[in-house]
Amino acid sequence: MDPYKYRPSSAFNSPFWTTNSGAPVWNNNNSLTVGTRGPILLEDYHLVEKLANFDRERIPERVVHARGASAKGFFEVTHDVSHLTCADFLRAPGVQTPVIVRFSTVIHERGSPETLRDPRGFAVKFYTREGNFDLVGNNLPVFFVRDGMKFPDMVHALKPNPKNHIQENWRILDFFSHFPESLHMFSFLFDDLGVPQDYRHMDGFGVNTYTLINKAGKAVYVKFHWKTTSGVKCLLEEEAIKVGGANHSHATQDLHDSIAAGNYPEWKLFIQTIDPEHEDKFDFDPLDVTKTWPEDIIPLQPVGRLVLNKNIDNFFAENEQLAFCPAIIVPGVYYSDDKMLQTRIFSYADSQRHRLGPNYLLLPANAPKSAHHNNHHEGFMNFIHRDEEVNYFPSRYDPVRHAEKFPIPPAVFSGRREKIAIEKENNFKQAGERFRSWAPDRQDRFIRRWVDALSDPRVTHEIRSVWISYWSQADRSLGQKIASHLNMRPNI
């Protein structure tokens, strides 16, 4: 019998109970004891195996995005973008690619409510013919900080207090008071969008700036946008309390039940592109993850549609063990020098190796559906059967060759080595424009949320003054209104 034909799978379940090694178990209810009331014997291997397995069921949860829900479906190209990219999965309208998508909250634990004010993760894994492509984004188009050096401290500030394990506003406001670049992100997070109704009724964004390369080697910067066809809907405070109090997994259940009922969620994919030769023409840096690209001057271009039409078969295998990394790209898509993207390229894969082990890409949910070949052998939990005699490259005994060369951006770099912020910070303009675009009632809700946060008794007068200064620079009336509610005087 070929042992590799019967790899562990529910498809090969026996009609009776067995141990992990396949031995039959005739009693799964009682331990092996001396008589009916005597001590349990250590030789009861089935009991020991059962308890030992149970003790190790849980794996480390994600340091961020721990709470999540996944679904499967397909991506279909609807518009020709072959002039922009040589990516095979985008080669022509009508091409379909299988996908798995994971939605998530960001800061709190695996079992936390899905009604908290928090960004939502929107990660898509494309199983293309040229390998996997992970587009790992959020439901908000910008981020808190522009340099990954700040990321660990940022997460620490947003996470619960290490002393009492309570998320506290004074810690968040203290940290970000040092970084006015966060203002634009807070204009989204403290807006109504900060609590989506569920995962179906929110947009998604690649957030970072990537690069597309066509067959001729021409490169353009690109931003990815997912637009829900269900409409964007949010929960206001009283609604969030009611929904979360009734069901702390409401968004997970909504996603599952909608797909099970045949009401398949769908998103349209759009892109924005900038020629790198024109990147200096704007009053913002196109590689700054705290900025959006104005759609009136950089219009959205339609690309395709994402449809989720199948629920996952197993939550642990296809959600907890599902792993994404922005470094996983395909020919025709490349990174940019976006500082946050550059750090995510390392950090995500490193985090997955910690959670799942060095061979996490061999797990079924993470492995490519296309043929693949390398000499990354062995290591913990490598369960792939290999019978090659040559595990080095090159070799005259192994016909494997290099793949055909594909274009990458032909950038030339020149400069001094230094740790320095970007020149075009422009931290206040877009946040102010966003606030002024809202109806008065929406502005009032935003102001109330900021007043509530700044009213935390541990927020000092100095920190309140900094935030009033920031919001005044974004919009003078906004800063004045926040100051008035706090019985303070604007300092700008």
Curated annotation (Swiss-Prot):
Chief place where the protein resides: cytoplasm
UniProt keyword list: Cytoplasm, Heme, Hydrogen peroxide, Iron, Metal-binding, Oxidoreductase, Peroxidase, Peroxisome
Gene3D superfamilies, per the entry: Catalase core domain
Origin: domain of life: Eukaryota
Catalytic function, reaction form: 2 H2O2 = O2 + 2 H2O
InterPro entries: Catalase, Catalase_AS, Catalase_clade1/3, Catalase_core, Catalase_haem_BS, Catalase_immune_responsive, Catalase_sf
This enzyme's EC code(s): 1.11.1.6
Residues engaged in binding heme: 348
Cofactor: heme
A Pfam entry, by short name: Catalase
Protein's name in the database: Catalase
